[in-house]
Amino acid sequence: MRILGIDPGLLTTGFGVVDSDGHALSYVASGTISTRHLGSGNLPARLKVLFDGIAEIAARYQPDASAVEIIFVNVNPQSTLLLGQARGACVTSLVNSNLSVAEYTALQMKKAVAGHGQAAKAQVQEMVKRLLDLPGLPGADAADALGIAITHAQVGRSMARLAEAAELSKTHAGTYRQGRSR
């Protein structure tokens, strides 16, 4: 399964694409979409750049699923609202590209990638490098996006195991009655 991970941001949005085949993860691509070249007063243009950029990435890499980091509530409510709009542009673009969208918090991603939810950016970058066998450290935004994709791959494996267990329990449920085998 090919997974597109997104770390939304109004100035810089990270993206990461990984392939998950059973227990193996492989790196496909990563990078950022930047709106820094646009003026700070040009919010609609920035949102369009994010929307179009995500659509282009989805068309180029043809992911089977996507995952997006859930935003945190910042001390500054205006910053939270702006980040929410950027995230909305990204999610809308993913849905418009006919992709399912899973959502994970930064804490969930850090725990899945680095082993604990309070991992520093540098620790996430190092673990993403190791998990995907990259030659160098990815940038912070790309590393977070790759981490979100890795988290979704791990959750997908867990859900597949649960589905298999549920199916197995259905086949064996009818063979036992009142504690005795038929």
Curated annotation (Swiss-Prot):
This is Crossover junction endodeoxyribonuclease RuvC. Homodimer which binds Holliday junction (HJ) DNA. The HJ becomes 2-fold symmetrical on binding to RuvC with unstacked arms; it has a different conformation from HJ DNA in complex with RuvA. In the full resolvosome a probable DNA-RuvA(4)-RuvB(12)-RuvC(2) complex forms which resolves the HJ. It is found in: Cytoplasm. Belongs to the RuvC family. Binds 2 Mg(2+) ion per subunit. The keyword DNA damage applies. The active site is at 7, 69, 141.
